[in-house]
């Protein structure tokens, strides 16, 4: 059934004319997907909160993309007083210039009352689970949604159906209140998460889940794939000319989230870590056989079987779950609901929440158990380290130690900035936020060419970054080993405290070569990789753990994470912690790959449309945007997408 719908989607794609150069996106232009972002009071974790929502809900609709095809996604900023951007998390190397959605790095944000058309080109090998989110302030807490790239033909793993499980944090403070506290000289922390949401539904510690009605909708509409679209006001309509998208049903009562399944089937569970703070550990009651087949999209891995999942902010895991047969359910007393239990880790105020795996729509949704359904492991540091390897090892392009040309250490420090009196996070002794520049770096390079480029020689003697521009330069095709080195806090209010960080790279995937306690020792880690015969898979988000008891002497090394990357995608890209509060406090870096000639790929006559805030590439009620079409409409997946049978690979 899934592939028959894909064939319909493919036929619509192939009917689009081939464009080239600059076009006016007037009423004749029909984008493939539309996202309208606004502000609304949302029933979140059984409480009300003002959230930034997408098409009326948080999370927003699940966007399904065909691999090997160009896609246009129109993003409207319907907010009155806030800028907006949209980042396509994990789809590295797959978007046109000025489309990465990072305001300080690659594009001006979308002004209130305007829209921007994002151009994305997927490749056949991009099949996997991703997500989109705003890259402005704390908006990504709620302004987010799933982004699924379908398989080009058959998946290498058989499954009958799939379910999306997107996790978010719930905070009682408003986005603005949290930002003000983080950036004040009288530092005020955001507070800990007050609830974990699964597909928009969860329970705050101040509330209690009640029993739900039989058949109540929850999560994304699996049966409405490619046909449902929810307008900005929350109403549903078909949008005949626009691909449809799954969307959650907003909660109307305080019940647990539900994952509906049928007996005796294999489900592909797409776990998405859209949390802005929390690292989660989770497992299913009486379902201990979970097979991880893909991590962070992009590449299938050799199967790894576990009994629980660990999910940090920005990470994704695709997991095969074999449900119980009808006979097994009968032998288990006709039990048709089982709890999914999830708990936060490495935070001072832990949270435990539940979802429900339900086998029968006629079964009422149970309330949360009074005692834990599972005992989940407390330690997170060694979960599946040095484990994930390619499904096809011969095709691995993971750089060896001998190929590494340079090592950059990003030492993570928390301290008071003497210039501002604010508490900040630093990487490699430098702090960066969206306020560090008066214009995006990519715009500056297009305008001034080599004069805007960072000094490579100066960076070599200054922790990897140029002191004049605060940018990390990399030569095209050089092989870097990037090490994030965790240390104890210098802040008197948290002296020696060590935090766990999810680190994410834009622009291209990296090969994760491990982690460990203390200070990074490249010789020891290379020996470990050799002894294991380990060839890592491509990743875009991995964890830097705190190790030990989470406290060392101020500035003392506490743990590390190492990546290897061949810098083969010229452009301007971010590497940053994916905890939103830490980003606002400066835990971000900007990398410039290649020289100006490599980066400037759009003619000046049209690229200048992107140079100003609210310029001609941004549409509004009175102006149709003038947009450069970077990719053509050649579909690299035509034969595979149209030729497979319905049941192949699923």
UniProtKB/Swiss-Prot annotation:
Residues that coordinate or bind Cu cation 2: 89, 133, 578
Glycosylation sites: 55, 83, 620
InterPro entries for the chain: Cu-oxidase-like_N, Cu-oxidase_2nd, Cu-oxidase_C, Cu-oxidase_fam, Cu_oxidase_CS, Cu_oxidase_Cu_BS, Cupredoxin, MCO_CuRO_3
Leader peptide range in chain numbering: 1-20
KW tRNA-binding (keyword) present: no
Activity response to pH changes: Optimum pH is 4.0.
Pfam families registered for this protein in UniProt: Cu-oxidase, Cu-oxidase_2, Cu-oxidase_3
GO molecular function, one term: copper ion binding
Annotated positions binding Cu cation 3: 135, 506, 576
PTM description: N-glycosylation Asn-55 and Asn-83 is involved in folding, conformational stability and laccase activity.
Span of domain Plastocyanin-like: 41-151, 162-360, 439-595
Binding site for Cu cation 4: 501, 577, 582
Binding annotation for Cu cation 1: 87, 504
Inhibition and activation profile: Retains almost half of its activity in presence of high salt concentrations up to 100 mM NaCl. Retains also more than 85% of its original activity in the presence of 1 mM EDTA, indicating a satisfactory resistance towards chelators, which is rare among metal-containing enzyme. The activity drops significantly in the presence of NaN(3) or SDS. Appears more active in the presence of methanol compared to ethanol, but acetone or DMSO addition severely affect remaining laccase activity.
Keywords: Copper, Disulfide bond, Glycoprotein, Metal-binding, Oxidoreductase, Repeat, Signal
Biotechnology: The thermophilic yellow LMCO1 presents a number of superior properties with potential use in industrial biocatalysis via its ability to oxidize a variety of phenolic compounds.
EC numbers: 1.-.-.-
Catalytic activity: 2 2',3,4-trihydroxy-trans-chalcone + O2 + 2 H(+) = 2 3',4'-dihydroxyaurone + 2 H2O
Catalytic temperature dependence: Optimum temperature is 50 degrees Celsius.
Disulfide bonds: 46-254
Function: Yellow laccase-like multicopper oxidase that is able to oxidize a variety of phenolic compounds including standard laccase substrates such as 2'-azino-bis(3-ethylbenzothiazoline-6-sulphonic acid) (ABTS) and 2,6-dimethoxyphenol (2,6-DMP). The existence of an ortho-hydroxy group is crucial for oxidation since pyrogallol and catechol, which contain ortho-hydroxy groups, are readily oxidized, which is not the case for resorcinol and hydroquinone, that contain meta- and para-hydroxy groups, respectively.
Family, similarity comment: Belongs to the multicopper oxidase family.
Subunit record text: Monomer.
Protein name, as recorded: Laccase-like multicopper oxidase 1
Lineage: Eukaryota, Fungi, Dikarya, Ascomycota, Pezizomycotina
């Amino acid at each position: 059934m899934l592939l028959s719908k894909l064939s319909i989607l493919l036929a619509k794609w192939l009917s689009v004319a081939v464009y080239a150069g600059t076009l006016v996106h007037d009423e004749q232009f029909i984008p493939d997907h539309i996202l309208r972002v606004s502000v609304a009071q949302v029933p979140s974790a059984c409480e009300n909160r003002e959230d930034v929502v997408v098409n009326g809900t948080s999370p927003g609709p699940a966007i399904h993309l065909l691999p090997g095809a160009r896609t246009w996604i129109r993003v409207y900023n319907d907010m009155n007083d806030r800028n907006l951007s949209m980042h396509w998390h994990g789809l590295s190397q797959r978007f046109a210039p000025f489309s990465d959605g990072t305001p300080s790095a690659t594009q001006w944000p979308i002004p209130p009352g305007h829209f921007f058309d994002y151009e994305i080109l997927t490749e056949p090998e991009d099949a996997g689970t991703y997500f989109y989110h705003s890259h402005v302030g704390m908006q990504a807490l709620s302004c987010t949604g799933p982004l699924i790239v379908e398989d080009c033909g058959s998946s290498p793993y058989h499954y009958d159906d799939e379910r999306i499980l997107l996790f978010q944090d719930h905070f009682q403070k408003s986005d603005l209140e949290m930002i003000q506290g983080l950036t004040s000289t009288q530092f005020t922390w955001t507070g800990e998460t007050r609830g974990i949401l699964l597909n928009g539904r969860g329970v705050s510690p101040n509330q209690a889940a009640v029993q739900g009605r039989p058949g109540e909708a929850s999560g994304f509409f699996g049966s409405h794939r490619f046909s449902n679209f929810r307008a900005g006001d929350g109403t549903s309509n078909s949008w005949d000319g626009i691909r449809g998208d799954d969307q959650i049903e907003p909660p109307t009562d305080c019940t647990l989230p539900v994952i509906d399944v049928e007996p005796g089937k294999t489900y592909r569970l797409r776990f998405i870590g859209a949390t802005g703070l929390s690292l989660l550990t989770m497992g299913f009651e009486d379902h201990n056989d979970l097979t991880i087949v893909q991590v962070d999209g992009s590449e299938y891995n050799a199967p790894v079987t576990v009994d629980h999942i660990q999910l940090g902010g920005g990470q994704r895991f695709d997991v095969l779950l074999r449900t119980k047969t009808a006979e097994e359910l009968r032998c288990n007393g006709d039990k048709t609901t089982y709890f999914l239990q999830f708990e936060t880790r490495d935070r001072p105020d832990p949270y435990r929440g539940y979802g429900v795996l339900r086998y029968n729509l006629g079964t009422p949704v149970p309330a949360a158990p009074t005692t834990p359904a599972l005992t989940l492991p407390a330690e997170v540091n060694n979960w599946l380290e040095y484990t994930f390897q390619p499904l096809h090892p011969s095709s691995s392009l993971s750089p060896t130690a001998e190929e590494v040309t340079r090592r950059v250490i990003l030492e993570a420090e928390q301290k008071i900035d003497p210039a501002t009196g604010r508490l900040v996070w630093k990487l490699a002794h430098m702090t960066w936020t969206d306020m560090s520049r008066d214009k995006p770096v990519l715009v500056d390079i297009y305008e001034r060419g080599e004069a805007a480029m960072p000094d490579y020689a100066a960076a070599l003697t200054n922790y990897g970054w140029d002191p004049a521009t605060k940018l990390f330069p990399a030569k095209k095709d050089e092989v870097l080993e990037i090490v994030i080195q965790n240390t104890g806090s210098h802040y008197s209010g948290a002296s020696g405290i060590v935090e766990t960080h999810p680190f994410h790279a834009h622009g291209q995937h990296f090969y994760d070569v491990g982690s460990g306690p203390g200070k990074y020792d490249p010789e020891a880690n290379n020996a470990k990789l050799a002894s294991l015969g380990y060839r890592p898979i491509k990743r875009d988000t991995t964890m830097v753990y705190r190790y030990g008891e989470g406290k060392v002497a101020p500035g003392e090394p506490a743990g590390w994470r190492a990546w290897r990357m061949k810098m083969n995608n010229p452009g301007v890209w971010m590497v940053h912690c994916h905890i939103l509060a830490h980003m606002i406090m400066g835990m971000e870096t900007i990398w410039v790959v290649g020289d100006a000639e490599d980066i400037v790929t759009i003619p000046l006559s049209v690229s200048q449309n992107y140079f100003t805030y609210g310029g001609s590439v941004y549409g509004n009620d009175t102006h149709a945007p003038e947009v450069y079409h970077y990719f053509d409409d050649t579909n690299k997946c035509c034969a595979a997408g149209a030729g497979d049978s319905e049941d192949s690979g699923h």
